Amino acid sequence: MGVDIKELVEPVAKEVELGFFSKKVIAIDAYNSLYQFLATIRQKDGTPLLDAQGNVTSHLNGLFYRTINYIELGIKPVYVFDGRPPELKQKELERRYQIKVEAEKKYREAIERGDLEEARIYAQQTSRLTAAMVHDAKLLLRYMGVPYVEAPSEGEAQAAYMVKKGDAWASGSQDFDSLLFGSPRLVRNLAITGKRKLPRKDVYVEVKPEIVELEELLRVHGITHQQLVVIGILVGTDYAPEGARGIGVKKALKLVKELKDPEKIFRSVEWSSDVPPEKILELFLHPEVTDSYELTWKEPDKEKVIELLVERHQFSMERVTNALDRLEKAVKTHFKQQSLESWFGF
């Protein structure tokens, strides 16, 4: 779900072309991207891509081709995977499960009615990412020579930490939580850049990447990072989705400016969760992160990629080999005056 502070972010978000990120390291929220691929890469009736054994492969399809697109533009992606979810998130995970169950029911009903448009919308809400699917995604990245990081807990917190350290230029995620975790820079729409159809409408829109600078966001609204986190908590986060009763973004912004002190603010509102807001504040300000990672980009192992995608999951041999040729060509084209070592080493 993520925190909904779009109202605050919109005035400072800047659209750019994907090529703007050439030569930049982007710490991408892996789960966020994989779920987007699972939601968008589907057949007309909403069915995801499947291999001969019935295993879902939409996530691998998106990860493979989108990552090659990044590298063709000179972008240096590093994918950050979630670790153990915080205990505070348990109720939200249960809520998401129930949403998927209800969506599956509505999907089946839409299929029975022959309403493929409605079926596809509900199908997108049923996406599940299993341990086996995550394992295959990591294998694919390893074989492609693209680094990934295993966060101890929240992937967005780890990505934000890497940007703060200077190991990455920006966090890449659709969710605004990255800003609450303190990422100096957030890039949205990376995984969905291009033409996208609007739900229930025969209308296509061009989706472009957008950049949000944390410092500018805070300056424009006259708040501190801690106050931004408090606003997010009041509006609702993954740890307490309901937030404070009757509090929207505008009212939350007014409260943090008037009362300033988080304890006073939390005492002044009707809290709708049994999770103490102080604990959520602590989690955002001091998340669990690690320095145990290495950002090294290597040459792809074409045979291993073919073994995983073509032999195990029945991808088209022609499409995969053509894509791998593009990957090799992209490295030579963009960095022909550098040795592979000088580019692939951060």
Curated annotation (Swiss-Prot):
Residues 118-260 are annotated as: I-domain. Binds 2 magnesium ions per subunit. They probably participate in the reaction catalyzed by the enzyme. May bind an additional third magnesium ion after substrate binding. One of its GO terms (molecular function) is DNA binding. PROSITE patterns: XPG_1. Residues 336-344 are annotated as: Interaction with PCNA. Mg(2+) 1 binds at residues 29, 82, 154, 156. It is an enzyme of class 3 (hydrolase). The keyword DNA damage applies. Its cofactor is Mg(2+). Interacts with PCNA. PCNA stimulates the nuclease activity without altering cleavage specificity. Structure-specific nuclease with 5'-flap endonuclease and 5'-3' exonuclease activities involved in DNA replication and repair. During DNA replication, cleaves the 5'-overhanging flap structure that is generated by displacement synthesis when DNA polymerase encounters the 5'-end of a downstream Okazaki fragment. Binds the unpaired 3'-DNA end and kinks the DNA to facilitate 5' cleavage specificity. Cleaves one nucleotide into the double-stranded DNA from the junction in flap DNA, leaving a nick for ligation. Also involved in the base excision repair (BER) pathway. This is Flap endonuclease 1. It comes from Thermofilum pendens (strain DSM 2475 / Hrk 5).
